[in-house]
């Protein structure tokens, strides 16, 4: 639990930007961040919809880390979660587009544009 709390206090720029959009959006889907699940701490999760969202920085680009991520995804899938992965760069530079992709994986979810999006225009 301490590690998850620490991660919530120090999000990456991409996690911070995406969290702002997910919190501001009126979708009816409630996300938690840095949540312990299955022995891992996931970046974001919508528990009722069984959806995990991971924001991967450059350290995820090497073969060893990719294999660890694959294993992690298999464990989470085995627990009934769908896992979506996005690059840190994409989450930081275009969090609204990333959020749109996330919402497309939430069947029956009606998305209403947020104040955050209108402020970006």
What is the predicted role of each segment?
Residues 1-29, 78, 107-121:
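Solvent-exposed, charged helical/coil patches
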Residues 7-11, 17, 33, 38-107:
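Basic, amphipathic alpha-helical patches used to engage nucleic acids or provide basic targeting signals
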């Amino acid at each position: 639990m301490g590690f998850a709390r620490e991660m919530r206090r120090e999000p990456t720029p991409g996690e911070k930007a995406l969290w702002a959009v997910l919190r501001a959006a009126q979708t009816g889907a409630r996300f938690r961040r840095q949540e312990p699940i299955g022995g891992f701490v996931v970046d974001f999760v919508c528990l009722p919809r069984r959806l995990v969202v991971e924001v991967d920085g450059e350290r995820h680009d090497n073969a060893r880390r990719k294999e660890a991520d694959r294993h992690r995804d298999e464990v989470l899938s085995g627990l009934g979660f769908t896992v979506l992965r996005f690059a840190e760069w994409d989450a930081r530079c275009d969090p609204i587009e990333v959020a749109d992709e996330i919402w497309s994986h939430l069947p029956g979810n009606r998305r209403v544009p947020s104040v955050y999006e209108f402020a970006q225009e």
